[in-house]
Amino acid sequence: APTYNQIEKMSKVTGIPLGYFFLEKPSVEDSSFVEYRTVDSKELSNPSRNLMDTLHDMELIQEWIRNELQATESDDLSFVGAIKKTVQNNDFATFVRRSLQIEINWYESCKNGEESFKLLRNYISDLGVVVMMSGIVGNNTHRILDTNEFRAFALVDKKAPLIFINSNDSFNGKLFSLLHEFA
C-alpha cells in the first residue's frame, strides 16, 4: 500500500484533490449544467480534471460577481435566455447584432481575427457578460487546457453570465466560440 507522502505526491502530479484518494468510491461530478464547445462539436461524456477544475473556478467567480450585483440591486440582463433554440439563423443573427449594437459588416474595419475577437469581446463585456480566458488551470502552467476537449463554455445566469474561452485556440476559433457561447 502507498504511504501518505506517496499519495500526496500523486495528488500533486495528477491534479486530483488529495481527499479523492481516500473515498470508498470515485466521486461522479455533474457537468450537465454547462454547455461547452469541442473541436467538431463532439459530445464529451467524461470531462477531464482540468476542465472540471476550470468550471469550478469559473463558478466561484460567477457566484462572487452575482452576489456583488445582487448587493447593489442590479437588474437582470434582459437578453439572457431571450432567444429560443428554434429561431431561424437570420433572426438569431439579427438578435445578436441588435444586442451588441453592431452593424452587419462590423468586422470589415478589423485587420484580422485577433482584432475582430478583441472588438467583439469588448462589445460583449460592455453588455455585462463576464468573458474569461486562459489556457491553463488556475495558475498552474503544467495543467494545460486541451482544445480537443473544449474550446469554450458558458455559465448562463440572468445577472452574471460568464463565457470562458480556451486561449490555446486560434483567434478565429476564439471568435467563433465567443459568438457561439454568447448565443
Regions found by a protein language model. Name each.
Residues A1-A183:
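Short juxta-domain linker segments that transition from a proline/glycine-rich
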